Amino acid sequence: MLVVDRELQEFLSAYSVNHSNSFLGKRDEQKLKVRERLMKEGLALFSSTGFEKTTVAHIVEKSEIARGTFYNYFPDTQKLFDALIEELNQNIKAAIQQTRRDSKNVYDYLYGTFKNYFELIGTPQMIQFHILNQAHIRQSSYQSNVIKTIVKNLNRDLKSDFKIKAFTEKYEFLLLSFMLVGSPPELFLATHTTNINFSNDQLATFLAKLFHKVLME
């Protein structure tokens, strides 16, 4: 009887642990889905009406969740906006790293990096998002840890991997890194707020030629 009781206890204990883990897994999955829905609806609203005209009330209405639930994920709309920028920057960082591995020369690296960037932000929704929220995107991006890492990696590459003769001072490489990061979004905004249409390939080719000439010639 003692053996049976012990076996039953062990079975119930194991069941309790497994059931608890399953519950936690489902709960975490549900939390992730809610967060993704908030970010999706937040992006849609920021893209259609702009950050300044978007409120928590608007987001929770579109997301079909309680207002209190929103604050379990973000303290305000600014933090949700920052999370969107951080996610975009993570995708940009991953694309740069992949391009770095695949490129056989400096020009290919520059072109591939710029082309991937323009394709990531070149959808109709992302174009509108950038046009309506220029100042907020700049502020959020340059405070982003991901952007700081991208600048740091570029600075390292420029100083060590590329045979650049025109620049020798450390501060010059840092400024070059900032220009490589800052130029694409400014060119993107300038061209998408005019009536002149440029393809992603044209924009990427122009920047690649420009920076290749500056860096290598």
Task: Report each predicted region and the residues it spans.
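Hydrophobic alpha-helical connector segments
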Residues: A83, Q97-T123, L176, L180, ...
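N-terminal intrinsically disordered/low-complexity leader segments
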Residues: M1-K33
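Hydrophobic/aromatic-rich alpha-helical bundle segments in the mid-to-C-terminal region
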Residues: F129-L132, F162-K209
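Amphipathic alpha-helical segments used for helix-helix packing
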Residues: N116-S141, L187-T193
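Amphipathic alpha-helical packing segments from all-alpha helical-bundle domains
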Residues: Q90-K93, Q139-I164, L174-F178, T205
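Alpha-helical DNA-contacting segments of helix-turn-helix folds
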Residues: F74, F81-N91, A95, F129-I131
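Short hydrophobic clusters on alpha-helical segments that form packing/core surfaces
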Residues: L38-F46, I92, Y117
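Helix-turn-helix
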Residues: R37, L45-K79, A83
